[in-house]
Regions:
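Long, positively charged amphipathic alpha-helical accessory segments at protein N-termini or as interdomain linkers
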Residues: 79, 139-162, 174-176, 180-241
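A glycine-rich, hydrophobic loop/mini-helix early in the fold
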Residues: 103-133
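Structural motif
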Residues: 170-171
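Short, conserved charged micro-motifs
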Residues: 98-100, 137-141
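Active-site loop/lid in soluble adenylation, ligation, and acyl-transfer enzymes
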Residues: 11, 15, 38-99, 112-114, ...
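Charged, low-complexity interaction regions
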Residues: 16-26, 36
Length: 241
């Protein structure tokens, strides 16, 4: 059985030995005695433990207010889980060009999320989540998406769900897009989950990639957005929605 608390104390001792110029012991060998297969296994378990120890404020908000709210949490260094159900079409624009005129003509709200990524389109049946927490060692978008993939794996066959950079794909189609807002001390993260087919809408707003790298849009069909929301909250807080 893994003893994460003892392993963390052992790591502190190892670091202190090095700072004091003492001959350090083999940390990689010692943690194996505490149940860890290797250093990567330990660091992943350490991050899981650190997140499990965090206290989060949980807040319902709207996608139109989320960006400002996330920035407010980050400025305050306040841990937060922001939950958002989308009930209208919204265009989240990054650094890439998109059909702004179509959005204006059809009264589609445009939100600038200040990212180097492309445009993400939300439809009426979406779930978005925002997370703000300390920028812990090893905490990345991939880490969080992998945890969400583990949830989806319970509903889909092996190999159907894949993490691809800042996206989650199901059977090769994009069902989730994520954005990160990291600073040296605070980690901000948002993810948008699709629960219906918006291929036609995306084709009208998003221009084809010059490199041909656009991912085919898909949607989650084996659990509802309420069920996904509850699963993510259980992972982060062990509390039901």
């Amino acid at each position: 059985m893994k003893n994460i608390k003892e392993a963390i104390e052992l790591e502190k001792q190892y670091i202190q030995f090095r700072l004091e110029g003492k001959e350090p012991f083999s940390f990689a060998n010692e943690i194996k005695k505490l149940g860890f297969a290797n250093l990567n296994d330990y660091y992943n378990a350490k991050l899981d433990y650190q997140i499990s120890e965090l206290e989060f404020s949980i807040e319902e908000t709207s996608p139109l207010e989320a960006a400002a709210l996330i920035m407010s949490y980050m400025r305050q260094k306040k841990n937060g889980i922001l939950l958002m159900d989308t009930h209208e079409v919204i265009a989240y624009c990054g650094s890439k060009d998109f059909n702004r005129d179509y959005c204006i003509e059809n009264n589609i709200p445009i939100i600038d999320y200040y990212s180097n990524g492309g445009t993400m389109i939300a439809s009426e049946n979406e779930f978005n989540i925002g997370l703000v927490m300390p920028h812990l060692e090893g905490l990345t978008s991939t880490y969080i998406l992998q945890k969400i993939k583990n949830i989806l794996d319970k509903y889909y066959d092996k190999g159907e769900v894949v993490v691809d950079h800042n996206d989650i794909l199901i059977n090769g189609k994009k069902v989730c897009g994520a954005t990160v807002y990291p600073t040296s001390e605070v980690f901000g993260f948002t993810a948008q989950f699709s629960f219906d087919d918006k291929s036609e809408l995306i084709s009208k707003i998003c221009y084809p990639s010059k490199s041909g790298s656009n991912k085919e849009p898909g949607f989650i069909d084996k659990l509802t957005r309420k069920e996904l929301r509850e699963e993510i909250l259980l992972w982060l807080t062990n509390k039901e929605a």
